[in-house]
Amino acid sequence: VNPIRRVWWIIIPAVVVIIIALLSAQTVSQYYVRSRLDPAVELQKAIDNMAGQSSYRFSLHSGFTVDERREVISSVEGEKEMGNTHIKGEMVNTPVDLYYLDQTIYNYDSFSKKWLVIDSGTTSSEDLLISELNPLSNFRFQTIDAVEKVQFEEIDGADCLLVKCHPTVESQLMESLWKDFEYLIWIDYKHSTIPKAHLTAANKSSNNTTLEITVGFSDFGKKMEIKAPTLSSNSN
């Protein structure tokens, strides 16, 4: 047998064994880390960290189901940096392109093809009670009942802990209209962020009406320049 070939016969199995050993060690390490995660602790850490994020991009899709008939409330994508927000998409079957900067709302009117400028009279987008402008408002809880670990899933390349809980929400508007809130929250436990969440709730006056909101978050802490639109320009 060729000596070089003999050497390769020795090297290749050895390399395979090393690779298998490394993969096994990685799997064992991941299993160990996962097994030590407390879902309630990880959820609170992620909520606190999300509240302190200076910037992020997001998507929000909301709707309700009445007797198995699906109605869309909104489908928007947006970005936030400090107190400034920009969203674009559709709300109640109407195109929306909206900025909130320095207490001023810039809303593109698709009918007149003009930007409308409105003094909101508020110091924060949170005061506008529009979930699409402040998606984190959906994660303000008064109390959280038992947090259940569901499984692990990969979201955008991140290993995420999926948890389920039934909190009491802080939003008086939400509480006045809906009940039996159930949240599914994907936690990137390595960075204490929430890349995805889904909530459902039942209507207080109609048991056959269910609310659903799905939110996605990304690009945490990235620099974004959200500037007022040029009023003579069209919506981009």
Segments from the language model and where they lie:
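N-terminal leader/targeting segments and the immediate start of mature chains
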Residues: 2-84, 222-236
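An acidic-aromatic
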Residues: 75-132
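Gly/Pro-enriched, hydrophobic low-complexity segments
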Residues: 156-234
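Solvent-exposed loop/turn segments connecting transmembrane beta-strands
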Residues: 66-70, 91-97, 205-207
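Flexible, processing/modification-adjacent segments and terminal tails
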Residues: 35, 108-175
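Short structured motifs
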Residues: 42-44, 146-151, 182
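Short, solvent-exposed coil/turn segments at beta-strand boundaries
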Residues: 51-57, 76-87, 98-105, 158, ...
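Beta-turn initiation residues at beta-strand->coil junctions
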Residues: 60-64, 89-92, 109-111, 198-203
